[in-house]
């Protein structure tokens, strides 16, 4: 990796697939980058709906859903890694703790990982640990992010992302949504996207992706089918303006 590529940090950015990127998973995709460092990157595709609605997902994990604003929302295909497991992107939910104490987070009884229902909860490993294993490929996901100053997330297994967002992998966030509480803005995906050391930088050098700082309105307030064009517009672009060729001439 060059010094220039090592200095790139695309955390809280969008990766926007160039028109010529024909990969089945990432063609015309917008990826929200949750974590990026010299060790790799992790993100969620935010514009590829899967077959499940949120209501269907909640039924599969034996929870009601009393959030009318979420019932018909699609569960997204976040990427090709661990597609049976849920990743919840949402506005940050803080819990105040005494400033003099910085306790390490322990796994409470409601720290069960989010799963799609295709495997029993007992058979599914804690997703946070799985993400760390995947970090051997991407080395991108911190075990549990320690929050700045005297604040930490109210949920058991959460990564804090600059820009006021969190990604939670424990079932407690679904339990909060189930009773009509929880974060106001929510995106749920099955699976995530990961890049190993230098891999994303190589793809950027090949002109596979455009990058732009993330706008949370695109994630949460824009219809799924419009997110690709809306992300492009953050750069002042339309898809027709770009060449279908990927790579250097």
Predicted segments with their positions:
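A short aromatic-anchored loop/beta-hairpin motif
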Residues: 1-188, 193-249
């Amino acid at each position: 990796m060059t010094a220039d590529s090592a200095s790139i940090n695309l955390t809280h950015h969008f990766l926007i697939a160039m028109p010529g990127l024909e990969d089945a998973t990432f063609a015309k995709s917008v990826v929200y980058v949750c974590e990026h460092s010299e060790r790799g990157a992790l993100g969620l595709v935010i514009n590829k709906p899967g077959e499940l609605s949120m209501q269907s997902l909640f039924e599969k994990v034996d929870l009601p859903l009393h959030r009318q604003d979420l019932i018909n929302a699609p569960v997204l295909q976040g990427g090709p890694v661990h597609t049976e497991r849920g990743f919840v992107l949402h506005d940050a939910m803080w819990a105040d703790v005494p400033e003099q104490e910085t306790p390490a987070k322990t796994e409470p009884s409601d720290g069960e990982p989010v799963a799609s229902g295709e495997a029993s909860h007992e058979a599914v490993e804690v997703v946070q640990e799985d993400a760390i294993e995947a970090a051997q490929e991407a080395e991108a996901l911190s075990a549990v992010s320690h929050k700045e100053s005297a604040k930490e997330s109210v949920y058991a297994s959460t990564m804090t992302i600059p820009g006021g967002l969190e990604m939670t992998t424990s079932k407690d966030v679904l339990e909060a949504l189930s009773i009509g509480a929880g974060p106001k803005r929510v995106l749920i995906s099955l699976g995530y996207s990961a890049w190993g050391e230098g891999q994303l930088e190589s793809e950027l050098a090949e002109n596979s992706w455009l990058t732009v700082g993330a706008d949370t309105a695109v994630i949460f307030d824009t219809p799924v089918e419009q997110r690709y064009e809306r992300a492009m517009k953050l750069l002042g672009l339309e898809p027709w303006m770009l060449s279908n060729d990927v790579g250097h001439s």
